[in-house]
UniProtKB/Swiss-Prot annotation:
Its cofactor is [4Fe-4S] cluster. It comes from Xanthomonas campestris pv. campestris (strain ATCC 33913 / DSM 3586 / NCPPB 528 / LMG 568 / P 25). This is 4-hydroxy-3-methylbut-2-enyl diphosphate reductase. The keyword 4Fe-4S applies. InterPro entries: LytB/IspH. Catalyzes the conversion of 1-hydroxy-2-methyl-2-(E)-butenyl 4-diphosphate (HMBPP) into a mixture of isopentenyl diphosphate (IPP) and dimethylallyl diphosphate (DMAPP). Acts in the terminal step of the DOXP/MEP pathway for isoprenoid precursor biosynthesis. Keywords: 4Fe-4S, Iron, Iron-sulfur, Isoprene biosynthesis, Metal-binding, Oxidoreductase.
């Protein structure tokens, strides 16, 4: 039995930046530092930051006056930003720049009076933040959430002739493609973004897991259950006909999965650290794996800048 590692896998530039913002804020300002929502969707990462002095909350009313709060990589609504400013909270914004790009698109369309269709999963914090970029004060446009092709058939928009779409950044490209095609059939004049809103890291990791699926008879994806992009990776492998499981760490591996398998593929979602992948590799070796190789994959060199204040503090 051998193991084939996907490449790329694990942390993306947005996740790296978000985690580093929390760490540096704690180092420079001292604990506690409040973080609205899990900064990234990974239990190991969140637990580590808690030990360093981060306090995770769901709403700003849980943050004391005069405290420092960090917005998670998933982004927040305009209402949250306004509330933080009203209360005079010190804010560091760890929103992924690729999510911020989507926010700007929504705001631009709304100011122009267009309606916007957001393709995404209800209840996901990124979707809540993007939906919250629209308000009556910012423009006459409206925003609608569509989760699947079936909802396209019943969608009723205010002005079909002035419509645009955008997507949650962590979805499956295949899923969004079908929804977009269905929307274009109903609304031929619909505008789209200049570039696909599915982020580069999501696309690269999905391409890599498909490479695994072509060569393996089992694919393990390291990631937490609430990680959208990690779930999509496991779904894609299963869709390509390969047995696949999403696991938080090595302890969740069922030895029965390995029985009879010759080639095991291993990848990690964009919010899962390499240390968890290393733990899974160690466990697979205990279960009989005797060789590890790695796909060539798509090189990634993207780096997102930290907030200026944290960069300056580090230099000083």
């Amino acid at each position: 039995m051998d193991v084939l590692l996907a490449n790329p896998r694990g942390f993306c530039a947005g996740v790296d930046r978000a985690i580093e913002i929390v760490k540096r804020a704690i180092e420079t300002l001292g604990a506690p530092i409040y973080v609205r929502h899990e900064v990234v969707h990974n239990r190991f990462v969140v637990d580590d930051l808690k030990q360093r002095g981060a306090i995770f909350v769901e709403e700003l009313d849980e943050v004391p006056d005069d405290a420092t709060v960090i917005f998670s990589a998933h982004g927040v609504s305009q209402a949250v930003r306004v509330e933080a400013e009203r209360r005079g909270l010190k804010v560091f914004d760890a929103t992924c720049p690729l999510v911020t790009k989507v926010h700007f698109e929504v705001a631009r369309h709304c100011r122009a009076g267009r309606d916007v269709v957001l393709i995404g999963h209800a209840g996901h914090p990124e979707v809540e933040g993007t939906m919250g970029q629209w308000s009556r004060e910012r423009g006459p446009g409206q925003i609608y959430l569509v989760e699947d092709i079936e909802q396209v058939a019943t969608l009723q928009v205010r002005q079909p002739e002035s419509l645009a779409y955008t997507t949650q950044t962590t979805l499956s490209v295949d899923d969004t493609m079908g929804i977009i095609e269905a929307l274009r059939v109903r609304y031929p004049a619909m505008q789209g973004p200049k570039h696909d809103d599915i982020c580069y890291a999501t696309q690269n990791r999905q391409d890599a897991v498909r490479d695994l699926a072509r060569q393996c008879d089992l694919v393990l994806v390291v990631g937490s259950p609430n990680s959208s992009n990690s779930n999509r990776l496991s779904e894609l492998a299963r869709r390509d006909g390969v047995e696949s499981y999403l696991i938080d760490n090595a302890s969740e591996i069922d030895p029965a999965w390995i029985v009879g398998k010759q080639h095991i593929g291993l990848t990690a979602g964009a919010s899962a650290p390499q240390v968890l992948v290393d733990g899974v590799l160690a466990r697979l070796r205990e279960l009989g794996a005797n060789g590890v190789s790695e796909l060539a994959g798509e090189p990634e060199s993207m780096v997102f800048a930290l907030p200026k204040e944290l960069r300056l503090r580090l230099v000083s």
